[in-house]
Every structure is written in structure tokens, then in C-alpha cells.
Design a protein with these regions (language model features):
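Local sequence-structure signature of Cys/Sec-based thiol-disulfide redox active-site neighborhoods
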Residues: 6, 10-49, 123-158
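Short Cys/His-rich micro-motifs in 6-15 aa windows
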Residues: 235-248
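Thiol-based oxidoreductase modules, predominantly thioredoxin-like and allied folds used
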Residues: 50-64, 158-172
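Thiol/disulfide oxidoreductase modules built on the thioredoxin-like
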Residues: 66-73, 173-182, 191-197
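N-terminal leader/targeting and pre-domain segments
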Residues: 1-22, 96-128
């Protein structure tokens, strides 16, 4: 049964939605104890806004659709924009994962996530689609920024494909990947990072997965093009992180200012 508090969070978030967004839910009638709650969550989203177009499929019975969306586990929510951009969320939607999905809906419907220009321009050099998986816990606030970066990069570049996975719901996956620390991020098929991942580290791991940089002579930074033993040189990493931190500080100031004005107006 879906908690009333969860329904309220969904209503408050999706009620003001102004642009259409498609949510595709994949479930299974067998072997999925959490799928009924996923269906209730999806219905609550549909009820919260007429702008939500909801489609539901069975991962086995609708194999053509699950193949089309690249779905490998249930339940999985695919949040899709009209231009084809898509983010997947697998597992029980509550806490951190629910907030991430709701934020993703708004990003797809309106303003895209902000990233330093050096990251956006460098991402254009990716030659193939790189799948990114972020494993997290719903009560892990430290997991949220990592997942936000992965989601944001996928929304800003067609060569990045992101899936957010609630780790506790898939013990076999945890065992296969030998996960010990969350968040746990997988780039491509084999590259992994534990814990916090900065924007510049994300960029570096994406290009490692892309295999654009071969070992040997004349290895250069993918951002500035200068000779460097790493895919992103130390100088560019510092500049990217400084720009990202400054942007976050400005956002926090604007948020604090808005809260103060709201308190004054209602006082």
C-alpha cells in the first residue's frame, strides 16, 4: 500500500507540471514482490498531473518493449522526453530515488541541469553511447548528488545513458558487482567507482569507458588538449570543480533568499 505521505510528495511535485512527460513502467506478475507498489506509485503520478502519459508493460510478455527500452530488471520506471532522452529508475521508489525521479520529470519538462561549459563541450567528443548505473540506498543523502550528476549528464548528452538502481532490491546484482560501499557507480561494462564522484571524475570515467584514449605516446587531456598522463588534466579538474562549486553556492543563496522572502510574506 502506498503511503499517504508519498502520494502527497508526488502531488506537490507534479501538480504544477506544464509540459508533457512520458513514464513507462515495466513490471512482472511473477517473482516481483515490490511490483504492486510500483504500479500504485505510477498511478499516483498519473493522477497528480494530466501532463503525465503513463504506459505499463510486462518485462516478459512485452519483450519487444523491454528490449526497446533496454530494461533488465523489474520494477523499472523509464522517464522519457519527446526528443527521446530517457532516464531509468529501478527498484522501490521512495526517499532519495523518488525525489530523483520527480526532479528528472521536471528537468525533462523544462530547464535542463547545469554543468560547467568545459564538461558540456568535451562530452560532444564521445563516440558511442556509454551506459552509467548508480546504485544507491533510499535513505542515503550522500548518494543523491552522485545520481544527480549521472542523470544530468544523460539529459544533456545523447551518448550518456543513466539508470538509477535501488541497491537493496537487487541482491544478486550487488553480489555480481561486489558492491561494498554506496553509492556505487558503473561506467560502461567494467569501470566502477565507490562513494562520491565529482563532475570531473565522471567526465574522465566516461572517456575511459569510451576507449578514446589508448595507452602510449601523445596522451592528451580531453578538455584542453594539452599533454597529460590522465584523461582530464589536474588543471582542468580544478577549474571544473571550482566552477561547479561556485554555481552551487549561487543556487543556495537564491534558495535561501526565496525562503526568506516567503517567510516574510506569510509572517
Amino acid at each position: 500500500m502506498l503511503k499517504e505521505s508519498t502520494k502527497q510528495i508526488i502531488r506537490d511535485s507534479l501538480g504544477p507540471l506544464k509540459q508533457p512527460v512520458k513514464i513507462v513502467l515495466f513490471t512482472s506478475d511473477t517473482g516481483c514482490d515490490i511490483c504492486p507498489d510500483a504500479i500504485l506509485t505510477a498511478r499516483a503520478m498519473k493522477a497528480a498531473s494530466a501532463k503525465i502519459a503513463l504506459e505499463t508493460y510486462d518485462i516478459a510478455m512485452d519483450r519487444d518493449k523491454s528490449d526497446e527500452y533496454g530494461v533488465k530488471r523489474v520494477p523499472t520506471f523509464a522517464v522519457q522526453a519527446q526528443d527521446g532522452r530517457m532516464i531509468k529508475f529501478s527498484g522501490t521508489l521512495e526517499g532519495v530515488s523518488l525525489l530523483l525521479l520527480l526532479d528528472t520529470v521536471h528537468s525533462i519538462a523544462g530547464v535542463r541541469p547545469w554543468f560547467p561549459e568545459k564538461i558540456l563541450s568535451t562530452l560532444k567528443m564521445l563516440s558511442q553511447k556509454i551506459p552509467v548505473q548508480v546504485l544507491l540506498e533510499n535513505d542515503c543523502t550522500l548518494c543523491k548528488p552522485v545520481a544527480e550528476t549521472a542523470v544530468g549528464l544523460a539529459l544533456t548528452n545523447k551518448h550518456v545513458s543513466t539508470e538509477v538502481i535501488v541497491a537493496d532490491d537487487y541482491p544478486e546484482l550487488l553480489s555480481t558487482l561486489k558492491v561494498k560501499i554506496l553509492p556505487f557507480t558503473v561506467f560502461g561494462k567494467q569501470l566502477t567507482l565507490e562513494g562520491h564522484v565529482s563532475e570531473s571524475s565522471f567526465l574522465e570515467m566516461l572517456f575511459k569507458a569510451d576507449r578514446q584514449k589508448a595507452a602510449g605516446l601523445d596522451v592528451r587531456c580531453v578538455v584542453c588538449g594539452q599533454p597529460s598522463p590522465e584523461l582530464v588534466c589536474t588543471s582542468c579538474k580544478t577549474k571544473i570543480q571550482a566552477e561547479a562549486v561556485e554555481h552551487k553556492r549561487k543556487d543556495e543563496k537564491l534558495s535561501d533568499r526565496g525562503s526568506a522572502m516567503g517567510s516574510h510574506n506569510h509572517g
